[in-house]
């Protein structure tokens, strides 16, 4: 087995005159052979000289192979590896954008919390108002007559969509019902509780019919 061999790194004190790289996996060479092509290849407006890395040399060779009339250049490579001085100038801008995004996210979260609180407050007010209305209806129904026209009364209906000009409020043994003009019945479960009178009447009927059966049999015998 062959062991892993770390590639040798070559360094330049001043760095590459094009990209400003101070270390490379290939050797640095003198830039005199390529200085005449720097202006068109890299879009430079000033003359540069010194050491050049192998990566920039390959870019010059690629530029020479371009077809005639081509305006392509590698200007984005110029000073691309200038070192930490260039990075420090870019970091504050990134931090500003991050802080701005954090401020926006905080504002959105605050708005969401306020919206949830508003909904919870509205729900609590409606829930607290509904139980307070039910005793009012029961007291009014007990004090009032058994049947009354809802159109003439000042009470508000149990249902907001209930038409008081059509439905008539009635008090029965099991509670309060609303009866229409054609006999239809509307029941509110909060005001209507089935009583046991119907069950008692149903159980009494078979007992009353039981003693009558022998009388019929005696008449047949006579």
Swiss-Prot record:
Domain of life: Eukaryota
Gene Ontology, cellular component aspect: Sin3-type complex
Polar residues composition-biased segments: 136-154, 210-222
Matches recorded under Pfam families: FAM60A (PF15396)
Biased composition regions of type Basic and acidic residues, renumbered to the chain: 111-121
GO process terms (BP): negative regulation of cell differentiation; negative regulation of cell migration; positive regulation of cell population proliferation
Disordered: annotated span: 111-154, 199-222
Keyword annotations from UniProtKB, A to Z: Nucleus
Principal location: nucleus
Keyword Nucleus part of the UniProt annotation: yes
The UniProt record lists the keyword Nucleus: yes
Functional summary from the UniProt entry: Subunit of the Sin3 deacetylase complex (Sin3/HDAC), this subunit is important for the repression of genes encoding components of the TGF-beta signaling pathway. Core component of a SIN3A complex (composed of at least SINHCAF, SIN3A, HDAC1, SAP30, RBBP4, OGT and TET1) present in embryonic stem (ES) cells and is essential to maintain the complex on chromatin.
Subunit structure: Component of the Sin3/HDAC corepressor complex at least composed of BRMS1, BRMS1L, ING2, SAP30, SAP30L, HDAC1. Found in a complex composed of at least SINHCAF, SIN3A, HDAC1, SAP30, RBBP4, OGT and TET1.
Family: Belongs to the SINHCAF family.
Name of this chain's protein: SIN3-HDAC complex-associated factor
């Amino acid at each position: 087995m062959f062991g892993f061999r770390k590639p040798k790194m070559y360094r330049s004190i001043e760095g590459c005159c094009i990209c400003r790289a101070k270390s490379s996996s290939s050797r640095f060479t003198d830039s005199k052979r390529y200085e005449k092509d720097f202006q068109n290849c890299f879009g430079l407006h000033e003359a540069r000289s010194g050491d050049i890395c192998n990566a920039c040399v390959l870019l010059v060779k690629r530029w020479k192979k371009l077809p005639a009339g081509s305006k392509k250049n590698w200007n984005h490579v110029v000073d691309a590896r200038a070192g930490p001085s260039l990075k420090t100038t870019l970091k504050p801008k990134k931090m500003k954008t991050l802080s701005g995004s954090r401020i926006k996210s905080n504002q959105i979260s605050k708005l969401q919390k306020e919206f949830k609180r508003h909904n919870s407050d509205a729900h609590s007010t409606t829930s607290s108002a509904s139980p307070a209305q039910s005793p009012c209806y029961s007291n009014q129904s007990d004090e009032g007559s058994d049947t009354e026209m809802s159109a003439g009364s000042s009470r508000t209906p149990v249902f907001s969509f209930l038409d008081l000009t059509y439905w008539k409020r009635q008090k029965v043994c099991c509670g309060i019902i609303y009866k229409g003009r054609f006999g239809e019945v509307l029941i509110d479960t909060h005001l209507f509780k089935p009583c046991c009178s119907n069950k008692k009447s149903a159980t009494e009927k078979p007992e009353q019919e039981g003693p009558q059966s022998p009388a019929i049999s005696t008449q047949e015998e006579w």
